[in-house]
């Protein structure tokens, strides 16, 4: 991952420095920009969705139930070392359910494990960590709660065609900075919506500012064009004035404060369902 490689360099900074600045930082998602191959996959899915709608189809989408496994990877057994409480984890699941329930998606906590490993806790040796900890199948969500992710608050992997037990299969899931969970101490980002955002990527969603003001943007028709990520909650922001609509600052796939986040669109719901059904729903391993 190109973006993630840069973030790992920052993660190697001394722990004392991380503690000094760790409670105040801007939102930054470490998920790689979608590859050409993945964009082509998204184009094909979008075309199928559009053709279905044009033909007068009305989708009776079944509810999606996702099993979730939490892996807390800390540098010590203290909260400041990333050792989050079970209450924080339960509250995080509640936040996810509140955000996704209107779109027919439910999350069930299936297990939580704790590991103290100073290297893994700062996102070192990602593949080795995931080979040791990953649980479930490709349709199950693994969330790795880490002490430090460099400049990022989280990152995740898009759904794709994978072979069981391949490296891509193991990499799947989301890594989340520990103090973004509900009750964490990261100013403006401690209500749990970093996980909401990253899980959106796990379902195949791009950032709302993908592609800027031109082209197909995020390939979802009902998200207004957006030139760049938002910061804070800039009401009335219109970074693409020649395009219809104000910037979707309340959309979970922007970079707004947790208090500003409110919604996914109907088109994003359809996209999440399409990706899940095509690449995850029937996974047996």
Swiss-Prot record:
Gene Ontology cellular-component terms listed: extracellular region
Binding sites annotated in the UniProt record for Zn(2+): 197, 201
Active site residues according to the UniProt entry: 198
Single GO MF descriptor: metallopeptidase activity
Pfam families, alphabetized: Peptidase_M43
Highest taxon in the source lineage: Eukaryota
Keywords of this entry: Disulfide bond, Glycoprotein, Hydrolase, Metal-binding, Metalloprotease, Protease, Secreted, Signal, Zinc
Residues spanning the signal sequence: 1-18
EC number(s) from the headed UniProt entry: 3.4.24.-
CDD domains listed in its UniProt record: ZnMc_pappalysin_like (cd04275)
GO biological process, one term: proteolysis
Disulfide bond entries: 233-260
The protein's enzyme class: hydrolase
InterPro entries: MetalloPept_cat_dom_sf (IPR024079), Peptidase_M43 (IPR008754)
Positions annotated with a glycan in the UniProt record: 282
Compartments, record wording: Secreted
Function, as annotated: Secreted metalloproteinase that allows assimilation of proteinaceous substrates.
PANTHER family given in the database record: METALLOPROTEASE MEP1 (AFU_ORTHOLOGUE AFUA_1G07730)-RELATED (PTHR47466:SF1), PTHR47466
Family statement: Belongs to the peptidase M43B family.
Protein name in UniProt: Extracellular metalloprotease SMAC_06893
Origin organism lineage: Eukaryota, Fungi, Dikarya, Ascomycota, Pezizomycotina
């Amino acid at each position: 991952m190109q973006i993630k490689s840069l973030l790992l360099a920052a993660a190697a900074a001394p722990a004392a420095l991380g503690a000094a600045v760790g409670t105040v930082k801007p939102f930054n998602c470490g998920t790689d920009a979608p590859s050409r191959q993945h964009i082509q996959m998204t184009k094909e899915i979008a075309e199928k969705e559009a053709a279905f709608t044009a033909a007068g189809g009305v989708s009776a989408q079944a509810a999606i139930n996702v099993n979730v496994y939490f892996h807390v990877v800390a540098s010590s057994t203290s909260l400041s070392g990333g050792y989050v409480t079970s209450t924080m984890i339960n509250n995080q699941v509640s936040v996810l359910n509140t955000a996704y329930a209107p779109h027919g998606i439910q999350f069930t906590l299936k297990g939580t494990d704790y590991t103290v490993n100073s290297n893994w806790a700062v996102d070192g040796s990602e593949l080795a960590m995931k080979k040791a900890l990953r649980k479930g199948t490709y349709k199950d969500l693994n969330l790795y709660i880490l002490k430090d992710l460099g400049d990022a608050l989280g990152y995740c992997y898009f759904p794709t065609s994978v072979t069981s037990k391949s490296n891509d299969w193991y990499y799947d899931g989301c890594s989340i900075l520990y103090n973004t969970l509900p009750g964490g101490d990261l100013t403006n980002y401690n209500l749990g919506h970093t996980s909401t955002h990253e899980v959106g990527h796990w379902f195949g969603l791009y950032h709302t500012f993908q592609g800027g003001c031109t082209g197909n943007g995020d390939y979802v028709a009902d998200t207004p064009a957006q030139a760049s990520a938002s910061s804070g909650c800039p009401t009335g922001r219109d970074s693409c004035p020649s395009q219809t609509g104000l910037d979707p600052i309340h959309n979970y796939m922007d970079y707004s404060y947790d208090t500003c986040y409110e919604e996914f669109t109907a088109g994003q719901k359809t996209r999440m369902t399409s990706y899940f059904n095509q690449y995850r729903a029937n996974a047996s391993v």
